[in-house]
Every structure is written in structure tokens, then in C-alpha cells.
Amino acid sequence: MAVQKVKLFTEAPFTLSLGGTLQDIEIAYQTYGELNKEKTNAILICHALTGDAEPYFADHSQRGWWQTFMGEGLALDTSQYFFICSNVLGGCKGTTGPSSINPKTNKPYGSQFPNIIVQDIVALQRALLTHLNIPRLHAVIGGSFGGMQATQWAIDYPDDVSNVINLCSSLLFGAEAIGFNHVMRQAVINDPNFNGGDYYDSQPPEKGLAIARMLGMLTYRTDLQLTKAFGRATKAETEFWGDYFQVESYLSYQGKKFLARFDANSYLHLLRALDLYDPGFQYESLSAALARIKARYTLVAVENDQLFKLTELQKSKKLLEESGVDLVYYQFSSDYGHDAFLVDYAFFEKKIRLALANQD
């Protein structure tokens, strides 16, 4: 089934946390399974940084980003639950973002797109569910950037969600991770084609975006995985200053592939939203915000995650416990590193099933 779309805030504007408003917001979303009569089996899936509204394709015509986790009888069981997943505000996969047409100018927003944070993304998701007449969620689940969204749901709408499942995401982004994001942003901003973000009528900043993606890929993997996959193997035809080693060729391929599916401005906005995430924003303190959580909270850490470091997840665990949150915590090692939440089904299956069944 094709992605569904709806336009909200066609009359009153949507007010953003850092100032400014948006109107006529288009939201791309997809649903799976059937909502029961009591409306007690709805689960919101929150995608990661560069994800989209289609984690799964029921006909297997394509491979969704959570294809191995979803389906009848799997951890995210489409025969038992009703799933909703929407593209985030600021994205480029159908929901209003910098590449969308600004209704005031009839041109892409570009540099005029307002600054957004996770709280705005979550507020728009709540508006979508209200439109779909879904008052309450059995669970909100997400990995990485999606885990931040899941956390904020439990804080901003404590009476609307029973379970939170946060995979590979801390409450606050670490300094090193912010540093990585800064370098990635600078690669894009300093591309000659960036033009301050107004590049839609000319060549986009492809070189900068490809470089940014290559760096990002290194934070999603582990040195062990890269060593197993490539070691020091070289290409059959080497380029002394280019793709000499196979690992270099892999990164170049990933950078080029990314250009076909993502917008540079969206990348910048979402990276900054990741950096700025603070669950306590607009509350008296972080602890006061966490104390609002009524949902059962499952937190899963990957010990060798290169992006969301184990120390940051352990700090999050401590903060949640001190705030009285009903917490279930797991940590494990995976060759996949941060990307384990996308591919390591063997480990995550039982944890997700237990969380959705309200069991330890």
C-alpha cells in the first residue's frame, strides 16, 4: 500500500518550540494491522535520523528498514497490533520539511524553514493520532533518534502511552557525538553548492552530503565489524588518492547512495534536533520531566555503540531510576554497534516481545 498523506493545521498554525510557526503541514504515514474495537492495541513506531514512514512492506516488494522485525508472528506482530509510523517533521520523505513548498512563497522553504526540535516532532505525531482518532497508545517504540521521540512521548503525554521502548538512545547526546554531527554539518555547509540552503533551483551540495554520510556510517558501525568485512583488503583496481582499500570503496558507495534518497537541509535540521534534545526542555528540570513518566520504560544499550556510548546509556538508566520510572534495562555487545537495533533481530526479539506484553 502506498504511503498515506494528510494535511493538518490548515487553519490555525502549528507553533514551534524555538519560535515560529508552520501551516498546511503535510504528514506522510503508514499503518499496519488492524485497530481493535477498544483501540487498545495501537503502537507508534518512531524512525531514526534518516528513516521514513515505511518500516515494513507486507508484500515484500521492497525491504523496509525494519523488515526483519515486523510481520505476522514476529516481534512487531502485525496480526496482534496496529502500527502507525510517520515521517518526521523536517524530513524529506513526504512530511513537510525544508524541501517542501512554502505556501507563502510557492517555493521550497530552503533557508526559511524554521528550527525544530524533538518536542515539535512528537507534538505533530500527537496531532496525527488525534486526526486518526487514536486517543491512547499501547506503546511507542524507536531506535536512536526514534528512541528520543519515544521518551518525549512519555513525558509530554504521560496519560497517552502505556509502554516506551527505547533502543540504543540516551536521554542526552554526548559531546563526542555532537562533535561528529558538527563535522558532518560543516561538510555540507561548506560545499560550494550549498548556497545558504537555497539550492533547489540548481545543483545540490552532493559532495558535502556524501562526505557527511561517510563519517556518519563510521559511527553506526564498529571497528570489529569493519575489520571482519574488509580488513586491509584493497580493490582490484586501486586509486592512490581515492578508493584504494575496500573499506574506502564501501564508504564511497554509501555516500553516493545516500544522495538519491535524502535532502541536505533535512539532514542538517535533524542532526541539530538530535544534538539539542533535552527531555527537560520547557519543564522545571530534567528530573521533573522524567518524573512525569507513567509508562513502563524499556531501555536497551549496546556496549560497543560508537554513537550513543554505553556510559551515556548508563547515565540515562540512573536518571530514570532516580526519577521513579518503572524501568527495565538491558545491555549487550553486538558487532553491529549502533545499527544493532536495525539488524540484530536475534537479540532484540525477546526484549521487544516482553516489553509489549508488560513482562520482565
From Swiss-Prot:
UniProt keywords, alphabetically: Acyltransferase, Amino-acid biosynthesis, Cytoplasm, Methionine biosynthesis, Transferase
Catalytic reactions of this protein: L-homoserine + acetyl-CoA = O-acetyl-L-homoserine + CoA
Pfam families: Abhydrolase_1 (PF00561)
Active site residues per record: 144 (nucleophile), 305, 338
Gene Ontology molecular function terms on file: homoserine O-acetyltransferase activity
Gene3D superfamilies: 1.10.1740.110, alpha/beta hydrolase
Family that this chain belongs to: Belongs to the AB hydrolase superfamily. MetX family.
Protein name as it appears in the record: Homoserine O-acetyltransferase
Species, as recorded: Pasteurella multocida (strain Pm70)
